[in-house]
A protein has these predicted regions:
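Arg/Lys-rich, alpha-helical DNA-contact motif
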Residues: 2-8, 22-34, 38-73
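Short coil turns linking two alpha-helices in DNA-binding domains
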Residues: 13-16
């Protein structure tokens, strides 16, 4: 799915999902022909749910990255 489709499916703002992507929290695959980022639907929906729950619990983005096993770049 595209990031726009994830926005519609989750209700999370585009800018927030883009930030999660840039931070490495939301993995994607990039289509070579048009450079569109594609996200795996189920994996992405689950990851967004996890991130939202951790944010609601007061966790910072660096803490979430550590908890989810995302390496710092």
């Amino acid at each position: 799915v595209t990031i726009g489709e994830l926005v519609r499916l989750t209700g999370v703002r585009y800018s927030t999902l883009k930030f999660y992507t840039e931070e490495g929290l939301l993995p994607f695959e990039q289509a070579e022909e048009n450079l569109t980022r594609r996200y795996r639907r189920q994996e992405s929906l689950q990851r967004i749910q996890e991130i939202r729950a951790l944010r609601a619990a007061g966790r910072s983005v660096p803490e979430i990255k550590s908890l989810l096993g995302v390496s710092a770049e």
